[in-house]
Structure formats: structure tokens, C-alpha cells
């Protein structure tokens, strides 16, 4: 089973979008690590789709129909809301800091404890946590 790619990767200037597409593809091939199944279309995936003005099920259908990430981005831009550079800055600022001094902090701390990472005071956001929990070097 495989982990998704890093949340720090960008597509169309947006963090997490490549990860969402990667999870959709890996899940369809039966390659996505089971711990990610319950969050498909929820959490960051769901928030990103809401922000983009698209339905997660429609994004899944389009992604599995094939094409490059850039082609799927073009579909998102045609079917979702028009995003400005400021919109991307707002999303990226929200996403990259989620878990740091906000309503998600208790959940992040629980996830760290459950993963044996409670001692890692350098993991202050979900993105930080994902990197280490999924075997990548922290940024």
C-alpha cells in the first residue's frame, strides 16, 4: 500500500490539489494505504473541493476518466469558480497552517500521539505531520 504524495506540492498554484488527485488515482487502483480511505472527499479534500466550487464525486469521475493533472486543472477551472491569485494565497495560507493554534489543534495532537509522534514539537501543522508520518523528511 502506498501513501499519498506531499501536501506541499502545488497544481495551479494550490497546495494539496496534487495530493487529492493522487489519492483518487491510488484508491481506484487499490494502492492507497487504508488509513486514508475514510478521509476521501473529507477533511482537506472536501474543503479544497468546496473552495474550488466543485463536487468531490465529479472530481473523482473526471480524474478517473484519465488525463494529466494539468488537464484536470483545466476541467476544474471550467467547472468551478474562477480563482484569483489572492484566492490561491488565502487557500495556501489556510491549508499550510491548519492545526497550528486553531480549532484543528486538538485533532492534530491526537493524531501525533496515536502515531507515536507526540514528542515532536516541530510538527505544528497537519502538513508537517503528514510529511513525517508518511515517511518524508520534515520541511
Question: For the regions a protein language model found, what residue spans apply to each?
Answer:
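Polar/charged low-complexity regulatory segments
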Residues: 1-35, 94-139
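Amphipathic alpha-helical packing elements
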Residues: 33-76
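Alpha-helix boundary/N-cap detector
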Residues: 8-15, 19, 39, 43, ...
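Amphipathic protein-protein interaction modules
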Residues: 59-115
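Aromatic-residue detector
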Residues: 47, 89-91, 124
Amino acid at each position: 500500500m502506498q501513501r499519498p504524495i506531499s501536501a506541499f506540492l502545488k497544481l495551479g498554484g494550490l497546495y494539496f490539489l496534487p495530493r487529492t488527485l493522487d489519492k483518487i488515482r491510488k484508491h481506484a487502483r487499490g494502492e492507497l494505504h487504508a488509513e486514508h480511505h475514510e478521509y476521501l472527499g473529507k477533511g482537506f479534500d472536501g474543503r479544497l473541493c468546496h473552495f474550488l466550487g466543485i463536487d468531490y464525486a465529479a472530481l473523482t469521475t473526471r480524474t478517473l476518466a484519465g488525463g494529466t493533472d494539468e488537464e484536470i486543472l483545466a476541467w476544474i477551472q471550467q467547472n468551478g469558480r474562477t480563482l484569483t491569485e489572492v484566492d490561491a494565497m488565502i487557500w495556501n495560507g489556510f491549508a499550510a497552517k491548519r492545526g497550528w493554534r486553531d480549532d484543528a489543534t486538538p485533532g492534530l495532537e491526537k493524531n501525533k500521539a496515536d502515531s507515536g509522534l507526540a514528542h515532536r514539537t516541530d510538527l505544528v501543522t497537519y502538513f508537517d505531520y503528514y510529511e513525517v508520518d508518511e515517511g518524508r523528511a520534515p520541511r
